[in-house]
Protein backbone atom coordinates (compact mmCIF):
# COMPACT_ATOMS: atom_id res chain seq x y z
CA UNK A 1 0.00 0.00 0.00
CA UNK A 2 2.77 2.44 0.90
CA UNK A 3 4.80 2.07 -2.30
CA UNK A 4 1.86 2.65 -4.69
CA UNK A 5 0.86 5.70 -2.63
CA UNK A 6 4.38 7.12 -2.84
CA UNK A 7 4.54 6.49 -6.59
CA UNK A 8 1.17 8.16 -7.05
CA UNK A 9 2.30 11.22 -5.13
CA UNK A 10 5.57 11.39 -7.09
CA UNK A 11 3.59 11.43 -10.33
CA UNK A 12 0.58 13.50 -9.28
CA UNK A 13 2.29 16.20 -7.18
CA UNK A 14 4.43 17.65 -10.01
CA UNK A 15 1.43 17.62 -12.35
CA UNK A 16 -0.68 19.39 -9.74
CA UNK A 17 2.01 22.00 -9.06
CA UNK A 18 2.52 22.62 -12.77
CA UNK A 19 -1.21 23.06 -13.35
CA UNK A 20 -1.51 25.27 -10.28
CA UNK A 21 1.37 27.50 -11.37
CA UNK A 22 -0.34 28.11 -14.70
CA UNK A 23 -3.71 28.63 -13.03
CA UNK A 24 -2.35 31.41 -10.81
CA UNK A 25 -0.35 33.07 -13.59
CA UNK A 26 -1.50 36.59 -14.31
CA UNK A 27 -0.43 39.80 -15.98
CA UNK A 28 1.12 42.05 -13.30
CA UNK A 29 -0.99 44.95 -12.11
CA UNK A 30 0.60 48.30 -12.67
CA UNK A 31 -0.21 51.77 -11.47
CA UNK A 32 0.87 54.87 -13.38
CA UNK A 33 -0.77 58.26 -13.84
CA UNK A 34 -2.73 58.39 -17.12
CA UNK A 35 -1.74 60.90 -19.76
CA UNK A 36 1.77 61.46 -18.46
CA UNK A 37 5.08 61.12 -20.22
CA UNK A 38 5.90 58.30 -17.81
CA UNK A 39 2.80 56.34 -18.78
CA UNK A 40 3.62 56.60 -22.48
CA UNK A 41 7.20 55.50 -21.93
CA UNK A 42 6.19 52.65 -19.61
CA UNK A 43 3.67 51.27 -22.08
CA UNK A 44 6.15 51.44 -24.97
CA UNK A 45 9.11 49.95 -23.07
CA UNK A 46 7.94 47.54 -20.34
CA UNK A 47 6.92 44.41 -22.22
CA UNK A 48 6.64 42.49 -18.95
CA UNK A 49 3.40 44.39 -18.31
CA UNK A 50 1.84 42.72 -21.35
CA UNK A 51 2.86 39.19 -20.39
CA UNK A 52 1.64 36.85 -17.68
CA UNK A 53 4.05 36.26 -14.83
CA UNK A 54 4.40 32.48 -14.55
CA UNK A 55 5.91 31.53 -11.18
CA UNK A 56 8.20 28.52 -11.18
CA UNK A 57 6.07 25.39 -11.61
CA UNK A 58 7.61 23.50 -8.69
CA UNK A 59 7.96 26.54 -6.46
CA UNK A 60 4.98 28.85 -7.02
CA UNK A 61 4.52 30.06 -3.45
CA UNK A 62 6.14 33.23 -2.15
CA UNK A 63 7.72 31.77 0.97
CA UNK A 64 9.24 28.80 -0.84
CA UNK A 65 10.47 31.00 -3.70
CA UNK A 66 12.19 33.30 -1.23
CA UNK A 67 13.87 30.40 0.57
CA UNK A 68 14.86 28.57 -2.62
CA UNK A 69 16.42 31.67 -4.17
CA UNK A 70 18.34 32.33 -0.94
CA UNK A 71 19.64 28.79 -0.48
CA UNK A 72 20.07 27.38 -3.97
CA UNK A 73 20.82 30.39 -6.16
CA UNK A 74 24.53 30.73 -6.77
CA UNK A 75 26.62 33.87 -6.37
CA UNK A 76 28.34 34.31 -9.74
CA UNK A 77 32.00 35.23 -9.56
CA UNK A 78 32.38 38.62 -11.24
CA UNK A 79 35.59 40.66 -11.63
CA UNK A 80 34.72 43.57 -9.34
CA UNK A 81 37.17 46.32 -8.47
CA UNK A 82 36.97 47.54 -4.87
CA UNK A 83 36.99 51.25 -4.03
CA UNK A 84 37.06 52.55 -0.46
CA UNK A 85 34.92 55.64 0.08
CA UNK A 86 36.08 57.87 2.92
CA UNK A 87 33.31 59.85 4.64
CA UNK A 88 33.77 63.25 6.26
CA UNK A 89 33.24 61.84 9.77
CA UNK A 90 36.14 59.38 9.47
CA UNK A 91 34.00 56.40 8.51
CA UNK A 92 34.38 54.35 5.34
CA UNK A 93 32.46 52.02 3.05
CA UNK A 94 33.42 49.71 0.22
CA UNK A 95 31.85 50.05 -3.21
CA UNK A 96 32.50 47.49 -5.93
CA UNK A 97 32.75 48.39 -9.61
CA UNK A 98 32.14 46.10 -12.57
CA UNK A 99 33.16 47.73 -15.85
CA UNK A 100 32.31 46.07 -19.19
CA UNK A 101 34.78 46.06 -22.05
CA UNK A 102 34.64 49.17 -24.21
CA UNK A 103 33.04 51.35 -21.52
CA UNK A 104 33.83 55.05 -21.47
CA UNK A 105 32.83 58.11 -19.46
CA UNK A 106 29.37 58.20 -21.10
CA UNK A 107 28.49 54.54 -20.48
CA UNK A 108 25.30 54.22 -18.37
CA UNK A 109 25.78 53.25 -14.72
CA UNK A 110 23.54 51.11 -12.50
CA UNK A 111 24.07 51.70 -8.78
CA UNK A 112 22.94 48.71 -6.67
CA UNK A 113 21.94 48.80 -3.00
CA UNK A 114 21.67 45.37 -1.28
CA UNK A 115 19.20 44.47 1.47
CA UNK A 116 19.50 44.76 5.24
CA UNK A 117 22.68 42.72 5.86
CA UNK A 118 23.61 42.04 2.25
CA UNK A 119 26.84 42.93 0.48
CA UNK A 120 28.43 42.43 -2.90
CA UNK A 121 29.71 38.87 -2.74
CA UNK A 122 27.00 37.18 -0.64
CA UNK A 123 23.79 38.52 -2.23
CA UNK A 124 22.71 36.43 -5.21
CA UNK A 125 19.62 38.62 -5.62
CA UNK A 126 22.03 41.49 -6.40
CA UNK A 127 24.71 39.62 -8.34
CA UNK A 128 22.39 38.19 -10.98
CA UNK A 129 20.92 41.62 -11.83
CA UNK A 130 24.49 42.97 -11.84
CA UNK A 131 25.39 40.32 -14.41
CA UNK A 132 22.30 41.27 -16.43
CA UNK A 133 23.34 44.92 -16.44
CA UNK A 134 26.97 44.10 -17.29
CA UNK A 135 25.82 41.97 -20.22
CA UNK A 136 23.83 44.97 -21.47
CA UNK A 137 27.08 46.93 -21.59
CA UNK A 138 26.31 49.07 -18.53
CA UNK A 139 28.72 49.88 -15.74
CA UNK A 140 27.70 48.50 -12.35
CA UNK A 141 28.60 49.56 -8.84
CA UNK A 142 27.40 47.85 -5.65
CA UNK A 143 27.22 50.12 -2.61
CA UNK A 144 28.00 48.26 0.62
CA UNK A 145 26.87 49.99 3.84
CA UNK A 146 29.34 50.75 6.60
CA UNK A 147 30.47 47.62 8.41
CA UNK A 148 29.61 45.27 5.54
CA UNK A 149 31.42 44.00 2.48
CA UNK A 150 34.69 43.45 4.32
CA UNK A 151 35.23 47.05 5.44
CA UNK A 152 35.39 47.33 9.23
CA UNK A 153 33.63 50.05 11.16
CA UNK A 154 35.89 52.96 12.03
CA UNK A 155 33.30 55.02 13.92
CA UNK A 156 30.09 54.39 15.84
CA UNK A 157 28.01 55.29 12.80
CA UNK A 158 26.43 52.35 10.97
CA UNK A 159 23.34 52.62 8.72
CA UNK A 160 19.55 52.64 8.85
CA UNK A 161 16.61 52.93 6.45
CA UNK A 162 15.68 56.51 7.35
CA UNK A 163 19.10 58.12 6.96
CA UNK A 164 20.33 58.05 3.34
CA UNK A 165 23.18 60.52 3.76
CA UNK A 166 25.97 58.02 3.10
CA UNK A 167 24.31 57.05 -0.15
CA UNK A 168 23.83 60.72 -1.03
CA UNK A 169 27.59 61.21 -0.56
CA UNK A 170 28.39 58.27 -2.84
CA UNK A 171 25.81 59.22 -5.49
CA UNK A 172 27.23 62.74 -5.64
CA UNK A 173 30.77 61.36 -5.93
CA UNK A 174 29.77 59.11 -8.83
CA UNK A 175 27.90 61.92 -10.58
CA UNK A 176 30.85 64.29 -10.28
CA UNK A 177 33.18 61.61 -11.64
CA UNK A 178 30.91 60.69 -14.57
CA UNK A 179 28.78 63.79 -15.30
CA UNK A 180 27.98 62.68 -18.86
CA UNK A 181 26.74 59.19 -17.96
CA UNK A 182 23.13 58.43 -17.12
CA UNK A 183 22.66 56.69 -13.79
CA UNK A 184 20.01 54.34 -12.42
CA UNK A 185 19.70 53.39 -8.76
CA UNK A 186 18.44 49.86 -8.04
CA UNK A 187 17.66 49.00 -4.42
CA UNK A 188 16.49 45.73 -2.89
CA UNK A 189 14.40 45.52 0.29
CA UNK A 190 16.07 47.83 2.84
CA UNK A 191 18.43 49.04 0.12
CA UNK A 192 15.35 50.14 -1.77
CA UNK A 193 14.12 52.00 1.30
CA UNK A 194 17.42 53.89 1.51
CA UNK A 195 17.24 54.67 -2.21
CA UNK A 196 13.61 55.86 -1.99
CA UNK A 197 14.33 58.05 1.02
CA UNK A 198 17.32 59.50 -0.81
CA UNK A 199 15.12 60.32 -3.82
CA UNK A 200 12.49 61.85 -1.53
CA UNK A 201 15.14 63.91 0.24
CA UNK A 202 16.77 65.23 -2.94
CA UNK A 203 13.75 65.53 -5.24
CA UNK A 204 14.64 66.94 -8.65
CA UNK A 205 18.23 67.48 -7.47
CA UNK A 206 18.98 63.75 -7.21
CA UNK A 207 22.29 62.63 -8.69
CA UNK A 208 20.46 59.83 -10.49
CA UNK A 209 18.30 59.75 -13.62
CA UNK A 210 16.00 56.97 -12.46
CA UNK A 211 15.21 54.52 -9.68
CA UNK A 212 14.09 50.90 -9.32
CA UNK A 213 12.83 49.60 -5.97
CA UNK A 214 12.44 45.83 -5.47
CA UNK A 215 10.47 44.26 -2.59
CA UNK A 216 10.87 47.19 -0.22
CA UNK A 217 8.51 47.51 2.77
CA UNK A 218 6.28 50.53 2.26
CA UNK A 219 5.40 50.78 5.95
CA UNK A 220 8.07 49.33 8.29
CA UNK A 221 5.68 49.22 11.26
CA UNK A 222 3.16 47.01 9.45
CA UNK A 223 6.00 45.00 7.91
CA UNK A 224 7.42 44.33 11.39
CA UNK A 225 4.04 43.06 12.58
CA UNK A 226 3.86 40.83 9.50
CA UNK A 227 7.27 39.17 9.86
CA UNK A 228 6.69 38.58 13.58
CA UNK A 229 3.86 36.15 12.80
CA UNK A 230 4.72 32.51 13.41
CA UNK A 231 5.92 31.30 10.00
CA UNK A 232 7.92 34.37 8.88
CA UNK A 233 9.34 34.76 12.40
CA UNK A 234 10.55 31.17 12.30
CA UNK A 235 11.92 31.26 8.75
CA UNK A 236 13.03 34.85 8.17
CA UNK A 237 12.89 37.28 11.08
CA UNK A 238 15.00 35.35 13.57
CA UNK A 239 17.59 34.62 10.86
CA UNK A 240 17.91 38.30 9.90
CA UNK A 241 18.09 39.33 13.56
CA UNK A 242 20.95 36.87 14.10
CA UNK A 243 22.79 38.35 11.11
CA UNK A 244 22.33 41.85 12.51
CA UNK A 245 23.67 40.80 15.91
CA UNK A 246 26.60 38.99 14.29
CA UNK A 247 27.36 42.11 12.27
CA UNK A 248 27.83 44.32 15.35
CA UNK A 249 29.12 41.69 17.81
CA UNK A 250 32.82 42.31 16.96
CA UNK A 251 32.36 45.97 17.93
CA UNK A 252 31.24 45.53 21.54
CA UNK A 253 34.00 47.80 22.83
CA UNK A 254 33.17 50.47 20.27
CA UNK A 255 29.51 50.64 21.29
CA UNK A 256 29.69 49.69 24.99
CA UNK A 257 28.95 53.22 26.23
CA UNK A 258 26.09 53.79 23.79
CA UNK A 259 23.92 50.66 23.99
CA UNK A 260 23.21 47.74 26.28
CA UNK A 261 25.20 45.21 24.30
CA UNK A 262 23.92 42.19 26.24
CA UNK A 263 20.40 43.23 25.29
CA UNK A 264 21.47 43.65 21.67
CA UNK A 265 22.90 40.13 21.62
CA UNK A 266 19.61 38.69 22.90
CA UNK A 267 17.57 40.11 20.01
CA UNK A 268 15.66 37.60 17.92
CA UNK A 269 13.59 40.04 15.84
CA UNK A 270 14.52 42.93 13.57
CA UNK A 271 12.33 45.22 15.67
CA UNK A 272 14.13 44.10 18.81
CA UNK A 273 17.47 44.95 17.21
CA UNK A 274 16.15 48.32 16.08
CA UNK A 275 14.86 49.03 19.59
CA UNK A 276 18.07 48.09 21.39
CA UNK A 277 20.66 49.27 18.85
CA UNK A 278 19.39 51.57 16.08
CA UNK A 279 17.13 53.75 18.25
CA UNK A 280 19.78 54.78 20.82
CA UNK A 281 22.49 55.03 18.15
CA UNK A 282 20.58 57.54 16.04
CA UNK A 283 18.50 59.30 18.67
CA UNK A 284 15.07 58.21 17.48
CA UNK A 285 12.36 58.48 20.14
CA UNK A 286 11.11 54.93 19.60
CA UNK A 287 10.70 52.22 16.97
CA UNK A 288 7.47 53.89 15.90
CA UNK A 289 9.34 57.17 15.41
CA UNK A 290 12.09 55.44 13.41
CA UNK A 291 9.62 53.54 11.26
CA UNK A 292 7.56 56.68 10.65
CA UNK A 293 10.65 58.49 9.40
CA UNK A 294 11.73 55.51 7.28
CA UNK A 295 8.32 54.84 5.70
CA UNK A 296 8.01 55.06 1.93
CA UNK A 297 4.24 55.29 1.65
CA UNK A 298 3.93 58.95 2.66
CA UNK A 299 6.62 60.26 0.29
CA UNK A 300 5.36 59.43 -3.19
CA UNK A 301 4.81 63.12 -3.96
CA UNK A 302 8.46 63.87 -3.13
CA UNK A 303 9.84 61.61 -5.88
CA UNK A 304 10.81 63.80 -8.85
CA UNK A 305 12.65 61.40 -11.16
CA UNK A 306 11.15 58.31 -12.87
CA UNK A 307 11.04 55.42 -10.42
CA UNK A 308 9.52 51.94 -10.72
CA UNK A 309 8.59 49.76 -7.75
CA UNK A 310 8.10 45.98 -7.80
CA UNK A 311 6.22 44.10 -5.08
CA UNK A 312 4.45 40.77 -4.66
CA UNK A 313 1.19 40.09 -2.86
CA UNK A 314 2.73 37.04 -1.14
CA UNK A 315 5.70 38.91 0.36
CA UNK A 316 5.62 38.93 4.18
CA UNK A 317 8.08 41.83 4.24
CA UNK A 318 5.88 44.18 2.26
CA UNK A 319 2.15 43.80 3.01
CA UNK A 320 0.34 44.84 -0.14
CA UNK A 321 -2.25 46.92 1.72
CA UNK A 322 0.49 49.42 2.54
CA UNK A 323 1.29 50.20 -1.09
CA UNK A 324 -0.13 53.71 -1.77
CA UNK A 325 -1.58 52.96 -5.20
CA UNK A 326 -3.83 56.04 -5.16
CA UNK A 327 -0.85 58.32 -4.49
CA UNK A 328 1.14 56.54 -7.20
CA UNK A 329 -1.70 57.20 -9.65
CA UNK A 330 -1.34 60.92 -8.88
CA UNK A 331 2.43 60.97 -9.42
CA UNK A 332 4.13 62.05 -12.63
CA UNK A 333 7.21 60.02 -11.75
CA UNK A 334 6.30 56.72 -10.05
CA UNK A 335 5.12 53.47 -11.62
CA UNK A 336 4.08 50.70 -9.24
CA UNK A 337 4.04 47.03 -10.31
CA UNK A 338 2.41 44.31 -8.20
CA UNK A 339 2.44 40.58 -8.94
CA UNK A 340 0.28 38.01 -7.18
CA UNK A 341 3.29 35.78 -6.53
CA UNK A 342 7.05 36.14 -6.41
CA UNK A 343 7.93 36.33 -2.73
CA UNK A 344 10.65 38.64 -1.43
CA UNK A 345 13.15 39.64 -4.18
CA UNK A 346 12.68 36.15 -5.74
CA UNK A 347 10.25 36.38 -8.70
CA UNK A 348 11.28 32.98 -10.09
CA UNK A 349 9.92 31.92 -13.47
CA UNK A 350 12.05 28.92 -14.38
CA UNK A 351 12.54 25.57 -12.68
CA UNK A 352 16.20 26.54 -12.30
CA UNK A 353 16.79 28.80 -9.26
CA UNK A 354 19.72 30.40 -11.12
CA UNK A 355 17.71 31.31 -14.19
CA UNK A 356 16.80 34.84 -15.22
CA UNK A 357 13.62 36.02 -13.52
CA UNK A 358 11.27 38.97 -13.50
CA UNK A 359 13.71 41.26 -11.66
CA UNK A 360 16.34 40.88 -14.38
CA UNK A 361 13.75 41.45 -17.11
CA UNK A 362 12.43 44.58 -15.41
CA UNK A 363 15.94 45.93 -14.89
CA UNK A 364 16.76 45.40 -18.57
CA UNK A 365 13.58 47.05 -19.84
CA UNK A 366 13.44 49.88 -17.30
CA UNK A 367 17.15 50.55 -17.75
CA UNK A 368 16.73 50.76 -21.52
CA UNK A 369 13.92 53.26 -20.99
CA UNK A 370 15.88 55.46 -18.58
CA UNK A 371 19.14 55.34 -20.51
CA UNK A 372 17.87 55.53 -24.09
CA UNK A 373 14.22 56.64 -24.23
CA UNK A 374 13.61 59.14 -21.43
CA UNK A 375 14.99 62.63 -21.82
From Swiss-Prot:
GO terms for biological process: medium-chain fatty acid biosynthetic process; medium-chain fatty acid catabolic process. One of its GO terms (molecular function) is acetylesterase activity. Keywords: Hydrolase, Serine esterase. Residues 108-203 form the AB hydrolase-1 domain. The active site is at 189 (charge relay system), 315 (charge relay system), 344 (charge relay system). Pfam families: Abhydrolase_1. PANTHER family: ABHYDROLASE DOMAIN-CONTAINING PROTEIN (PTHR10794), ALPHA_BETA HYDROLASE 1, ISOFORM A (PTHR10794:SF63). Belongs to the AB hydrolase superfamily. AB hydrolase 4 family. This is Protein abhd-3.2.
